[in-house]
Amino acid sequence: MHELTYLQAGVIGLLQGITELFPVSSLGHSVLIPALIGGSWQHLVTENASGNSEGSPYLTFVVGLHVATAVALLVFFRSDWARVIRAFLTTLRTRRIETSAQRLAWLIVAATVPVGIIGLALEHTFRTLFAKPLAAALFLTANGMILLAGERLRRRSEQRAGTHQASARAEPATIPLTVPAPATVPTQTTSAPGGRATARHTTAPRGGLVVSEHRSLDTLAYREAGVIGLFQTLALLAGISRSGITMVAGLLRGLDHEDAARFSFLLATPVILAAGLLKLPALAGPAGDGIRGQVILGALIAGIAAYLSIRFLVRYFETRTLTPFAIYCLLTGALCTVRFAIA
């Protein structure tokens, strides 16, 4: 790792800051780009793939940049996190969940616990086995397929729901029957994190993979949040995007793109921060000798790039979808697969 130059640190920091939050896999790009450039850059990936230490020095450096990315997330969503943390502490004191902010706090906890446990147990194994150029290219292609499939499933579900509603309106009048009212999930009319008011009642979703009804973030069930958290563990595979996989899971459970992206970014904050903090002791010890300046430079660039990326993506997902990112992952993954398969 002593061969890491300031140029390499800056480029990798920029790459990390952008791709960590775009649904295109930061780890996959951190493996593929150096391998494509070759030379001393290729050596970084070769060193990573050797797996003969407790952790690859290169991946230790990359994960160390996560602290800067997490700080960017905390700064951008500072008002959200202030509300969520206050709400969480209030529930610990009162032992009741009464507001949308309090519910969101526990949804984040429910989604973070699974990835925390599995990540601690399997991170080293997964990254030693799969953080290689060909594997990263294959998983990047798979990431594109997941994003595209999620968008198509969501669109078909909405179309079916619209067809059923139109058919119901067109049906002739019938003898009225007394039937039970649909179950509702009561929620208080409060401002959710971000300042948006929540609905007073939301129809409870039916079972199944895809929920066709549009739902607000704070109406997710805790088990649904836990499943979304389990989806995050796929991001241990270089090429699978954490933000992409959690957004797809949110879309399938009825969230719109804006709420799915917001929940994804909120979930990413504690996970990315914890991953970075776990690696900081290694960088502060002998393993960091000769590269601490490079880490600082990379972290500064990663933090700035991450903040700008969040700002762009929050606005982007107000009106747009994951489809362009899916196409990018499919094309890039396929080209890289061919490149490294014949190398």
UniProtKB/Swiss-Prot annotation:
Keywords: Antibiotic resistance, Cell membrane, Cell shape, Cell wall biogenesis/degradation, Hydrolase, Membrane, Peptidoglycan synthesis, Transmembrane, Transmembrane helix
Keyword Ribonucleoprotein assigned: no
Coiled-coil boundaries: none
Biased segments, Low complexity type: 179-193
UniProt-annotated location(s): Cell membrane
Residue numbers spanned by region Disordered: 179-202
Signal peptide: none
Membrane-spanning residues: 21-41, 57-77, 104-124, 129-149, 225-245, 265-285, 294-314, 322-342
Keyword DNA damage: no
Enzyme kind, highest EC tier: hydrolase
Catalytic reaction annotation: di-trans,octa-cis-undecaprenyl diphosphate + H2O = di-trans,octa-cis-undecaprenyl phosphate + phosphate + H(+)
An annotated Gene Ontology molecular function: undecaprenyl-diphosphatase activity
Known EC number: 3.6.1.27
Membrane topology type: Multi-pass membrane protein
One biological process term in Gene Ontology: cell wall organization
Any Gene Ontology CC annotation: plasma membrane
HAMAP family on file: Undec_diphosphatase (MF_01006)
Record's miscellaneous remark: Bacitracin is thought to be involved in the inhibition of peptidoglycan synthesis by sequestering undecaprenyl diphosphate, thereby reducing the pool of lipid carrier available.
Family the entry assigns: Belongs to the UppP family.
NCBIfam families in the record: PRK00281.3-1
Function: Catalyzes the dephosphorylation of undecaprenyl diphosphate (UPP). Confers resistance to bacitracin.
Protein name in UniProt: Undecaprenyl-diphosphatase 2
